[in-house]
Amino acid sequence: ITLFLNCGMRLSELVGINISDINFKERKIKLLGKGNKERMIYLNDACIQSLQDYIESRENSILEPDALFLSKKGRRISRRRVEQIVEETLQATGLSGKGISVHKLRHTAATLMYQYGNVDTLTLKEILGHKSIATTEIYTHLSNDILKNAADSSPLANIKNKKK
């Protein structure tokens, strides 16, 4: 969940990560995105710590030694299992049934970067691995709608100035 929310990666990108794709020294990770397109994303402290903690605690696999995330059987974790883990985490935190999905975590990451990280749409396009800026702009329009709705929902929104 830390990687989804901090990096905005796709589910397929997460399950495809190999240990050899992570460069802790340069704080970056190589992802294989849509259309087998490679991209590098940089990791913040939360991601570095989560990855280091996970690697230290995970069992090594003879079957797939380079796969980062493993199933209990020592194989690369499946997309479905990641979805189940996310759902289990949501249930444990009381957030289950609220329409949150793995893909919504990606949307949330993009929205947070755009709103609070001073990340422009071109940079966000590269981080998310979008082919077209139009796809990225969906996230920014969503953010602007949220901001407009927030302004409109103010209890002071309907107070009018009295003319003197």
Task: Give names to the regions the model predicted.
Residues 45-96:
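Active-site/catalytic core of tyrosine-dependent DNA strand-transfer enzymes
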